[in-house]
From Swiss-Prot:
Pfam families: RNA_pol_Rpb1_1, RNA_pol_Rpb1_2, RNA_pol_Rpb1_3, RNA_pol_Rpb1_4, RNA_pol_Rpb1_5. SMART domains: RPOLA_N (SM00663). The RNAP catalytic core consists of 2 alpha, 1 beta, 1 beta' and 1 omega subunit. When a sigma factor is associated with the core the holoenzyme is formed, which can initiate transcription. Zn(2+) 1 binds at residues 60, 62, 75, 78. GO terms for cellular component: DNA-directed RNA polymerase complex. Binds 1 Mg(2+) ion per subunit. Keywords: DNA-directed RNA polymerase, Magnesium, Metal-binding, Nucleotidyltransferase, Transcription, Transferase, Zinc. This is DNA-directed RNA polymerase subunit beta'. Zn(2+) 2 binds at residues 890, 967, 974, 977. Belongs to the RNA polymerase beta' chain family. It comes from Rhodococcus erythropolis (strain PR4 / NBRC 100887). GO terms for molecular function: DNA binding; DNA-directed RNA polymerase activity; magnesium ion binding; zinc ion binding.
Length: 1318
């Protein structure tokens, strides 16, 4: 077998019959499979041992040679080579066909490659191949020309003979008629009898004339057909063809079936054809030119790559190895077989019958019919169902052909090559493990023992608990006492990977150090649930074991959960307290008035109450019941840093650990601050979830990850502790309906009745009534909600859970305790009848029914969304999988300008709302200079929160930052343009697969995006697409629904207002040609423009517009933006539009992820004029390739090619990738492979998918070349220390040391054990 690590590219091409015979180990002659009595393969059959190799290791068919010592001998009795049985997985056979057949992929694919090559319409091709028409394959022009006059004279003579014969016959008949009539007259017959005789005679004469005319016409047709005969001409009329052959057989040759195609191919001159096509393209117009371009693609492909077009017609069919189409015996003694065997059997049967017919010299019509059937059977084998009805097996199920084995989710690519199952894995239900540290998980003992079995066995032998591996295995299986101690030792510091399906982003699989636990459930740390999207209602997780030292190191360094606190999408912490923990911390940091032991100012009689010298003293007071944790106290602190302003006041030199200061706070808050790093400023406020998030964010920005991990772990422990102490529970009696509710409802019901009456009087139409009612009831719901919030006491657990941010929101509480309000119907419109009851009071039947409307739609939507979102992620991954960080800095000067703040009218700076996702975590492309010319932040600096704060203080509003959109690295991107990795907070490493991270970051929140299309007020009909469909529309670069025109030029608007349409004319400022936009529907409103002074107005006659400005409401067509504004603007447009959708759902994704995808969409150029380059006009090519070819041509003094950038949707861009392996495994497998084979495409194995498919390490992370080509040389000391170990005797390094102490895996196959040993 060839080693995948030793080749750098993989080429695919057309196999000629010669190649097929060279691969083959023998010809399959019989359709038999195995003998029903002996169950051994039949000789020369589809499973023949002589061709494919022995079925048992080292054993020939007849049993003469058994055992490995006869290796390589070919048995003289049965002809089987003595070798391993696994050669039956790799040896191929072949079938010699009695007649050539065409390959269905090249004839039936769209477009038909055979048709393009031979310039035949697919319909005609089909007639030729399936024996419905003859085709002329050769004409002897010279001979025909020379003898044309002679032949013409002969033809004239023949025609004259026919005419003379006709005249003679007519003459004779006319005389006979005259004689008959004379005779009748003599007899005195009646006139009607005479007339009948006359009519009869004339009819016969007419028939004679017609017959002669037909004969003459036939001779004319034969002659004209013959004189105009040309190669590739079809003759459908069989009689005509036979006549031609009889008369003029020596002047031409004709044929039908694949043989004729083969002859045409042999006589085909590629170079001449390519030249004539190029000429047509140069001079032609319209359809003719287009067709020539398409044909030239195919012709040029064969011309340049040494592929012979003869490969499209087969004389031999390869037979794949039998182990890949096995036959297995089922329990009942019956056999299950692969469909391929049936398909091969049909081919062999028909082929053998055809051979016999040809030997017998059967009539041509019978032979042709058999050849057609052979063609159809080979078609079914290659691609069943592509033409005509598919061949079916038992139960009318179409058989799976070779193409079907590759296609689709269940095909070879996606099922076996890209998604393999792995050994050393297990799965179980998860339960919460609150006692674990962030980097730990609880692994059930039994599961751990099974997973670590080989390690335990080795260790048992090392420790002399067992004599050999076999007895160690027995010990483990019997679970002896020593085994558990050894297991404990083996799993120490050996990380395991936990994965929860669906793995939507890279945090769906993380590494943990296992802790052995009783029971059978895996214990999971509560803080990683967010990343895994796990809960404990029966979720299951899979465990995988990294085996090699390198794998363990990667798992520990890159994948350990405590190193993955930040989200790769936004760079914000994911491992944050949630639910119970939030409630606990919120309760702990509360400040209650009027509770035990609170601070009391000194009076004349008493000293100050509630003052403590240290937190420890306060804690003692709590323990003895004299103080509440939530009471306000004064306490002296020495181990916590004071807040910033206080620190500047008290400690001008800066606070040091141990400096004392007094805080007025609660003990709970002191306890909370003890969890934070000592030098973090004291936080003296209540802690809802948002505030906790801000603090952890801040820690992640300013402290090492290990500190953050320890801090969140402490927060988790304390959160759970105080959540328990807080006694927060929810019961039905906690749901309090506000007493004011009936009055409010009554008041608004009166208003609603008024509207209803107006409607019935006809003062309002239905639409007006509905919108008025909706307004009334929305107001009512708000009022009830406010009353309810006011009515809840502070101590009530429900508002506490909501206010702390642990779960739920006030709208949900309003449904429970206030009123549900208005609900929507499936169209997304409000139903004007509100639900006036709360869930506590209970709904009426009608209310219940109305409510189910929305609820069902929600569930249906979620199901659809999940599938759509998964497919979007798949396309995104596919388009961006080869974007890998390849170098540190591409050295470009370019960048994009981002806004970090806006100046208000009064001169104050307001931080831009989107700094988080646009400027943060990027690299500066140019020095940031303030108004005085001072450099605030230098070029090349990383923009973290501190740097952005510095820029804001200096009054800078915009900065130029590096971006992947402007990166000039050839393949992939450079680290500086990408900026910092969101997940680590440092500059991205070389080898990071940023493309896949980007795809995951965009795809993962996809499920949260709404499905529905929004109804914009007043826009009926033309819905504005939102949510997931809008994201798909943008990434697929489709023309949006309800597209808005954009201004092609800068100028003044002339607006004409028609009945149903607007007409907008723009008069350009530069005096150029006017641009007219006609037939703009009035259902789409004109665009609202914001003026500098804050006014808003609709686009009006005489307004001035800038180039690229939208003229109507709706979404601009990205292709238009590209045409008018250029590639950079369309990139920024797409990024902003995608962000719009995600922001509306409150999802934070950094712009750089969207930029990575958008960059892939604009990688190609359409060639307009090829100049002196090799490119074909109209073809798509990579921008880098285009530029390098142009540079080369210009250097040689030639004419460069002209091209224009083209925006491709992600599906199209994935299929257009340079890697045929990646494209074939994505979609349209047969089409991609057909194309790749004709063009003899070579896959450079640059992306990830191609390498996964062939089984190489992926060129990302530590698999990238610059990390792989490193050799470690031990120092002298290390060497001395290693060899000082006494047990390393020389014998261990001898060849038959059986793998002892070398650390190598023992290749058991090479030792002559019989099969049963394993």
């Amino acid at each position: 077998m060839l080693d995948v690590n030793f080749f750098d590219e993989l080429r695919i091409g057309l196999a000629s019959a010669e190649d097929i015979r060279n691969w083959s180990y023998g010809e399959v002659k019989k359709p038999e499979t195995i003998n029903y009595r002996t169950l051994k393969p039949e000789k020369d059959g589809l499973f023949c041992e002589k061709i494919f190799g022995p079925t048992r290791d080292w054993e020939c068919y007849c049993g003469k040679y058994k055992r490995v010592r006869f290796k390589g001998i070919i048995c003289e009795r049965c002809g089987v080579e003595v070798t391993r049985a696994k050669v039956r997985r790799e040896r191929m056979g072949h079938i010699e066909l009695a007649a050539p057949v065409t390959h269905i992929w090249y004839f039936k694919g769209v477009p038909s490659r055979l048709g393009y090559l031979l310039d035949l319409a697919p319909k005609d091709l089909e007639k030729i191949i399936y024996f419905a028409a003859y085709v002329i394959v050769g004409v002897d022009e010279e001979l025909r020309h020379n003898e044309l006059s002679t032949l013409e004279a002969e033809m004239q003579v023949e025609k004259k003979t026919v005419a003379d014969q006709r005249d003679a016959d007519l003459e004779a008949r006319a005389q006979k008629l005259e004689a008959d009539i004379a005779e009748l007259e003599a007899e005195g017959a009646k006139s009607d009898v005479r007339r009948k005789v006359k009519d009869g005679g004339e009819r016969e004469m007419r028939q004679l004339r017609d017959r002669a005319q037909r004969e003459l016409d036939r001779l004319d047709e034969i002659w004209t057909t013959f004189t105009k005969l040309s190669v590739k001409q079809l003759i459908i009329d069989e009689l005509l063809y036979r006549e031609l052959v009889d008369r003029y057989g020596e002047y031409f040759t004709g044929a039908m079936g694949a043989e004729s195609i083969q002859i045409l191919m042999q006589n085909f001159d590629l170079d001449a054809e390519a030249e004539s096509l190029r000429e047509t393209i140069r001079s032609g117009k319209g359809q003719k030119k287009l067709r020539a371009l398409k044909r030239l693609k195919v012709v040029a492909a064969f011309q340049t790559n040494g592929n012979s077009p003869m490969g499209m017609v087969l004389n031999a069919v390869p037979v794949i190895p039998p182990e890949l189409r096995p036959m297995v015996q089922l329990d009942g003694g019956r056999f299950a077989t692969s469909d391929l065997n049936d398909l091969y059997r049909r081919v062999i049967n028909r082929n053998n019958r055809l051979k016999r017919l040809i030997d017998l010299g059967a009539p041509e019509i019978i032979v042709n019919n058999e050849k057609r059937m052979l063609q159809e059977s080979v078609d079914a084998l290659f691609d069943n169902g592509r033409r005509g009805r598919p061949v079916t097996g038992p139960g009318n199920r179409p058989l799976k052909s070779l193409s079907d084995l590759l296609k689709g989710k269940q095909g070879r690519f996606r099922q076996n090559l890209l998604g393999k199952r792995v050994d050393y894995s297990g799965r179980s239900v998860i339960v919460v493990g609150p006692q674990l540290k962030l980097h730990q998980c609880g692994l059930p003992k039994l599961m751990a023992l099974e997973l670590f079995k080989p390690f335990v066995m080795k260790r048992l032998v090392d420790l002399n608990h067992a004599q050999n591996i076999k007895s160690a295995k027995r010990m483990v299986e019997r679970k002896r006492v020593q085994v558990w101690d050894v297991l404990e030792e083996v799993i120490a510091e050996h990380p395991v990977l936990l994965n929860r399906a669906p793995t939507l982003h890279r945090l769906g699989i993380q590494a943990f150090e296992p802790q052995l636990v009783e029971g059978k459930a895996i214990q999971l740390h509560p803080l990683v649930c967010e990343a895994f999207n796990a809960d404990f209602d029966g979720d299951q997780m899979a465990v995988h074991l990294p085996l090699s030292a390198e794998a363990q190191a990667e798992a520990r360094i890159l994948m350990l959960s405590s190193n993955n606190i930040l989200s790769p999408a936004s760079g914000r912490p994911l491992a944050m307290p949630r639910l119970d923990m939030v409630t606990g911390l919120f309760h702990l940091t509360r400040l209650d008035e009027g509770v035990t032991g609170e601070l009391v100012a000194p009076t004349n009689d008493e000293a100050e109450q509630g003052v403590y010298s240290s937190p420890a003293e306060a804690q003692m007071a709590v323990d003895r019941g004299a103080l509440s944790v939530q009471a306000q106290i004064k306490v002296r602190l020495t181990q916590q840093r004071p807040p910033r302003d206080l620190e500047n006041e008290l400690f001008p030199e800066g606070w040091k650990y141990g400096d004392g200061w007094t805080a007025t706070t609660t003990l709970g808050r002191v306890l909370f601050n003890e969890l934070l790093p000592a030098d973090y400023p004291f936080v003296n406020e209540q802690m809802p979830k948002k505030r906790q998030a801000t603090i952890i964010n801040d820690l992640a920005e300013r402290y090492p990850m290990i500190v953050v991990a320890q801090t969140v772990d402490k927060l988790k422990d304390v959160g759970f502790y105080w959540a328990t102490r807080s006694g927060v529970t929810v019961s039905i009696s906690d749901v309090l309906v506000p007493p004011e509710k009936p009055a409010i409802i009554e008041d608004f019901e009166a208003q609603a009745d008024k509207i209803e009456k107006q409607y019935q009087r006809g003062a309002l139409d239905k639409k007006e009534r509905n919108s008025a009612l909706v307004t009334i009831w929305q107001e009512a719901t708000d009022k009830v909600g406010k009353a309810m919030e006011a009515h809840f006491p502070d101590s009530n657990p429900i508002p506490m859970i909501v206010k702390s941010g642990a779960a739920g929101n006030m709208t949900q509480v309003r449904s429970l305790a206030g009123m549900k309000g208005l609900v929507t119907n499936p169209k997304g419109e409000f139903i004007p009848r509100p639900i006036k009851s709360s869930f506590k009071e209970g709904l009426t039947v009608l209310e219940y029914f109305i409510n189910t409307h929305g609820a069902r739609k929600g569930l249906a939507d979620t199901a659809l969304r999940t599938a759509d979102s998964g497919y979007l992620t798949r396309r995104l991954v596919d388009v961006s999988q080869d974007v890998i960080v390849r170098e540190v800095d591409c050295g470009t000067e370019r960048g994009i300008v981002t806004t970090i703040a806006e100046k208000q009218a009064d001169g104050t700076m307001i931080r831009d709302a989107h700094v988080e996702t646009s400027t943060y975590a990027r690299t500066l492309a140019a020095d940031a200079v303030d108004a005085n010319g001072t450099v605030i932040v230098e070029r090349g600096h990383d923009l973290g929160d501190p740097a952005i704060d510095a820029l804001l203080e200096a009054g800078i509003t915009t900065v130029k930052v590096r971006s992947v959109l402007t990166c000039t690295t050839g393949t992939g991107v450079c680290a500086t343009c990408y900026g910092r990795s969101m997940a680590t907070g440092k500059l991205v490493d070389i080898g990071e697969a940023v493309g896949i991270v980007a795809a995951q970051s965009i795809g993962e929140p996809g499920t949260q995006l709404t499905m529905r299309t929004f109804h914009q007020g007043g826009v009926a009909g033309d819905d504005i697409t939102g949510g997931l469909p809008r994201v798909q529309e943008l990434f697929e670069a489709r023309v949006p629904k309800g597209k808005a025109p954009i201004a092609d030029v800068t100028g003044r608007v002339q607006l004409e207002d028609g009945d149903r349409f607007y007409k907008i004319t723009i008069v350009p400022d530069d005096g150029g040609e006017e641009v007219v936009y006609d037939k703009l529907s009035k259902r789409q409103r004109l665009r609202v423009f914001k003026h500098a002074d804050g006014r808003e107005s609709l686009l009006a006659d005489g307004d001035h517009v800038e180039v690229g400005q939208q003229l109507m409401e709706g979404a601009a067509d990205p292709h238009e933006v590209l045409r008018v504004m250029g590639p950079r603007q369309v990139q920024i447009h797409l990024v902003n539009e995608v962000q719009e959708v995600y922001r509306s759902q409150g999802v934070s994704i950094h712009d750089k992820h969207i930029e990575v995808i958008v960059r892939q969409m604009l990688r190609r150029v359409t060639i307009i004029d090829s100049g002196a380059t090799e490119f074909l006009p109209g073809s798509l090519t990579e921008r880098a390739e285009f530029e390098s070819a142009n540079r080369r041509v210009v250097a040689e003094g030639g004419e460069p090619a002209a091209g224009r950038p083209v925006l491709m949707g992600i599906t199209k861009a994935s299929l257009a990738t340079d890697s045929w392996l990646s494209a074939a495994s994505f979609q349209e497998t047969t089409r991609v492979l057909t194309d790749a084979a004709i063009n003899c495409r070579s896959d450079k194995l640059i992306g990830l998918k191609e390498n996964v498919i062939i089984g190489k390490l992926i060129p990302a992370g530590t698999g990238i070349n610059r990390y792989r080509n490193i050799q470690v040389q031990p120092t002298e000391e290390a060497r001395a220390a290693a060899y000082a170990v006494p047990s390393y005797d020389d014998q261990y390094y001898s060849p038959d040391g059986f793998g002892q102490n070398t650390g190598a895996a023992v290749p058991l196959d090479d030792y002559g054990f019989s099969n049963d040993y394993r």
